[in-house]
Amino acid sequence: MQVIASFCSKPNENEFVGRRQLLSSVCSKISQGDVVSHPPVSSVKVTQDWKSNLHELAVKSVPSTTRRILLTSLFMNLCFNPSRYLSALALGDPSVATVEDVSPTVFPAGPLFPTEGRIVQLFEKNTYSVVNIFDVTLRPQLKMTGVVEIPEGNGSGVVWDGQGYIVTNYHVIGNALSRNPSPGDVVGRVNILASDGVQKNFEGKLVGADRAKDLAVLKVDAPETLLKPIKVGQSNSLKVGQQCLAIGNPFGFDHTLTVGVISGLNRDIFSQTGVTIGGGIQTDAAINPGNSGGPLLDSKGNLIGINTAIFTQTGTSAGVGFAIPSSTVLKIVPQLIQFSKVLRAGINIELAPDPVANQLNVRNGALVLQVPGKSLAEKAGLHPTSRGFAGNIVLGDIIVAVDDKPVKNKAELMKILDEYSVGDKVTLKIKRGNEDLELKISLEEKSS
């Protein structure tokens, strides 16, 4: 229904009053309790100011029943569509809003928790001992003299001492090592973080590498003031559950810190070089590509391992990380620096592969196949496997223990002997037929 009233805003000028304007005034007066009986709606000529007589016009023109209907409609509209009419009231006048009215309260940062502060200190102290290593391949330039460096990958390393020795993984510079470089050849580029936050780049020259333990040593000609050697701790006393920190350059993001705990000890690490490394440290600290060669630290900031691998089915850090224990690093690195290789202790005899030993019903121990003549093993009295007069196989000695350390198979014997040095004397417990014997033998340098 639409109610229209003609009125004059000026003398002799007719205007029409819209429904919304009329409704607004009517509702205002009704809410004040004005009740007047009215004649039927009609067009009324307004001769006075419409602003002052609009209410009187509406009261006289609109019956009480109609007013109640209009009021009810307005009330229901406000209930079901409040945002249409009340948004301005809720939001206020934006023209008078200030920054202080809408800004949240800002609280000061405050001091760090003790655990946070300790981790921050450990990182700030050791981050300068961590370097970024880029493996490079030198290739001849076409139609030009000289060579060009082709970056192959990147990893991490640690400053070993103030003389410029850098320890990293074998596989970090594996592409360069596949060319069989000589000691002193450039096999990578090393970035060292200075105290002012600037990365200094140096040539990484090969000192020595050990594929069996996935370790390598480089040398950089950097000023001693730039070199911050890392402190090496003992890994023999580690406990599962203690906190550890890993620093490295995952995915090229230099000097990244991850925190976790030691989740396992004495693990066999299947390294990227394809060899098995015993005694590994297992951790849940995230170790990604680029972390290899970086340090694993204990809660005191001491090096307890060199990060080397991650077991994952996704190719990311959502898996289990492994580190070469510092006890192994302390044994290998000094030899690489002194001899450019590792002098491994061994017996220098030929042992039967485990599948062959199993076929010969040797279920426990390492079966001796051959013993070189005039060797220390022959002098100690070890017997090889041979054939009898009838062509039957006569089993040689079976090594079942080294200094009371049980030997289950050939791989176990190699792992045990790797703990000794050249010249050490050990006692071998062997089975010879139905006899149990003990033989003393001096370990010699393992032949390649």
UniProtKB/Swiss-Prot annotation:
Ranges for domain PDZ: 336-433
Record region (Serine protease): 152-333
GO annotation (BP), single: photosystem II repair
Pfam families named among the record's database cross-references: PDZ_2, Trypsin_2
Protein name: Protease Do-like 8, chloroplastic
Role: Probable serine protease.
Compartments where found: Plastid, Chloroplast thylakoid lumen
Native source organism of the sequence: Arabidopsis thaliana (Mouse-ear cress)
Classification via InterPro entries: Chloro_Bact_Ser_Proteases, DEGP1/8_PDZ_dom, PDZ, PDZ_sf, Peptidase_S1_PA, Peptidase_S1_PA_chymotrypsin, Peptidase_S1C
GO molecular function: peptidase activity; serine-type endopeptidase activity
Gene from which the chain derives: DEGP8
SUPFAM superfamilies xref list: PDZ domain-like, Trypsin-like serine proteases
PANTHER family: PEPTIDASE S12, PROTEASE DO-LIKE 8, CHLOROPLASTIC
Cellular component per GO, a single term: thylakoid lumen
Active-site feature positions: H171 (charge relay system), D214 (charge relay system), S292 (charge relay system)
Entry EC number(s): 3.4.21.-
SMART domains, alphabetized: PDZ (SM00228)
Superkingdom of the organism of origin: Eukaryota
